[in-house]
């Protein structure tokens, strides 16, 4: 029951943020799916469908914004080229801060040492 509430919360958050950022970027998208992915925070299909990991609702809002912008940027560039990151940076100039947070959290969660910075969790 709790997981279902998390997924509903995630659907609401990602639906609102995708609509907002899609207008800023000047792109459209298909459907939004909320998933429990083990290795991804989000993805964008070649048809423009967006998938987001519901666990992101526990991340700082800036990180959620980054994932949404990252996936929507794929509607302009279906790769991780310089042009892709230029799209991301045009909306979120400090996106590298959010990328680092995500990388650090993943290392923390899956590390054998379990040495995590208190600011991450």
Language model feature labels by segment:
Residues 1-66, 75-121:
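Active-site-proximal or metal-binding-adjacent scaffold patches in catalytic folds
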């Amino acid at each position: 029951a709790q997981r279902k509430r998390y997924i509903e919360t995630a659907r609401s958050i990602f639906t609102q943020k995708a609509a907002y950022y899609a207008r800023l970027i000047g792109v459209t998208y298909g459907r939004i799916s909320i998933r429990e992915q083990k290795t991804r925070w989000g993805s964008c299909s070649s048809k423009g469908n967006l998938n987001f990991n519901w666990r992101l609702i526990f991340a700082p809002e800036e990180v959620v914004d980054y994932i949404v912008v990252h996936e929507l940027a794929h509607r302009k560039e279906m790769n991780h080229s310089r042009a892709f990151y230029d799209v991301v940076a045009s909306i979120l100039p400090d996106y590298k801060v959010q990328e680092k947070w995500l990388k650090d959290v993943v290392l923390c969660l899956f590390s054998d040492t379990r040495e995590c910075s208190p600011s991450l969790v």
